[in-house]
Design a protein with these regions (language model features):
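Short, flexible helix-loop junctions that flank or precede catalytic/ligand sites
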Residues: 1-189
Length: 189
């Protein structure tokens, strides 16, 4: 999709940013889009995009930076984290005006992600218009101390069912893991 909002949720340390970078890598490899990221801090340097580090102490906020980057006519905007109402509203506006916006938010599951966005005064009608998908991640370790990711995912079709108050289908871990393998987040082990 060329425009809309894709959200990855989970707790601190669940790999949300790593997944966002893998998605950006895939977009860059397949489509060569103008990508701008807003991050606090920049976690992985990427040479194919403009990365802006957020520093609220210096007055460089997500909200102000989002307003400024629109002058660069980005195709894809990564907002490292939606933390407040202003950032949520501006990310929504960017998605509504033809940009692809990728972001993270702290929420325990996909449905709670929608509720968090609504608590930031994003209407369910606006979410219905722009949400492309929601993925929630939980990082776990097995008995050998190897990391694996548990994910749930709701695609756009099922999000529309949710907003129409119909039964929705979650993608189980195996489907989400296949997607993550394709974008380079999980190896073949």
């Amino acid at each position: 999709k060329d425009s809309g909002l894709f959200v990855i949720s989970g707790a601190t340390g669940s790999g949300k940013s790593t997944t966002l970078y893998a998605i950006l890598d895939a977009i860059n490899k397949m489509y060569k889009k103008n990508i701008i990221t807003l991050e606090d801090p920049i976690e992985i340097n990427k040479d194919y995009c403009l990365q802006i580090e957020i520093d609220d102490r210096k007055g460089i906020s997500y909200h102000e930076s989002l307003k400024q980057i629109l002058r660069h006519d980005p195709d894809v905007i990564m907002v490292g984290e939606v933390r407040d109402e202003k950032t949520a509203q501006l990310a929504l506006t960017c998605a509504l005006t033809g940009h692809l916006v990728l972001t993270t938010i702290h929420a325990s599951n996909c449905i709670n992600t929608i509720k968090r966005l609504e608590n930031l005064n994003i209407s369910s009608l606006d979410l219905e218009d722009v949400l492309l998908g929601i993925m929630t991640q939980k990082m776990r370790f097995n008995d050998k101390k190897e990391v694996f990711i548990l994910s749930e995912y709701i695609d756009q079709k099922n999000l529309l069912k949710y907003f129409d108050r119909k039964k929705i289908d979650y993608y189980d871990f195996s489907k989400a893991a296949c997607t993550l393998k394709n974008v380079g987040v999980l190896n073949e082990k």
